[in-house]
Amino acid sequence: MTEYKLVVVGAGGVGKSALTIQLIQNHFVDEYDPTIEDSYRKQVVIDGETCLLDILDTAGQEEYSAMRDQYMRTGEGFLCVFAINNSKSFADVHLYREQIKRVKDSDDVPMVLVGNICDLARTVDTKQAQELARSYGIEFVETSAKTRQGVEDAFYTLVREIRHYRMKKLNSREDRKQGCLGVSCEVM
């Protein structure tokens, strides 16, 4: 069974834990209890493949920012979550993305932009979020942990992005092994 290490990042209070718990336990948590760090595991079937999702739900509060580098190093893919009723959390997405790219030392990291709390009045327009995602070259999903709208879609889209990334890396590794005549070469 293939395992995927997913990390949920974003500002405090955007609903990262609520999204994760809704996926794992089919339950909406409506009271806000700031997370330091929680880990969850769930077996799911995505596109016919049985997968084990290892999900790290992270602290959004600034006082825990020193821990971010560590979990960003181990994550394979990232849900960058903002609240559609909080423009500051939308602006903060850029900071999380830049930190992920720095820690991973790559511009090419599997990531999905998630606009959460879509069941409430918005201050961030859907078009703004779509344009930001397009500029980053990533997918955008709107979610509501309360109604469960888009929750599976967000996590499953990230798994598909990780699969795509793994295949791309595997193919580029295979290409490097090929000589100019199409003969496999290995350096001893």
From Swiss-Prot:
UniProt PTM: Palmitoylated by the ZDHHC9-GOLGA7 complex. Depalmitoylated by abhd17a, abhd17b and abhd17c. A continuous cycle of de- and re-palmitoylation regulates rapid exchange between plasma membrane and Golgi.
Record: residues binding GTP: 10-17, 57-61, 116-119
Lipid-acceptor residues (S-palmitoyl cysteine): C180
Modulation of this protein's activity: Alternates between an inactive form bound to GDP and an active form bound to GTP. Activated by a guanine nucleotide-exchange factor (GEF) and inactivated by a GTPase-activating protein (GAP).
Record-linked Gene3D superfamilies: P-loop containing nucleotide triphosphate hydrolases
Membrane topology, as annotated: Lipid-anchor
One biological process term in Gene Ontology: Ras protein signal transduction
Annotated function: Ras proteins bind GDP/GTP and possess intrinsic GTPase activity.
Name under which the protein is recorded: GTPase NRas
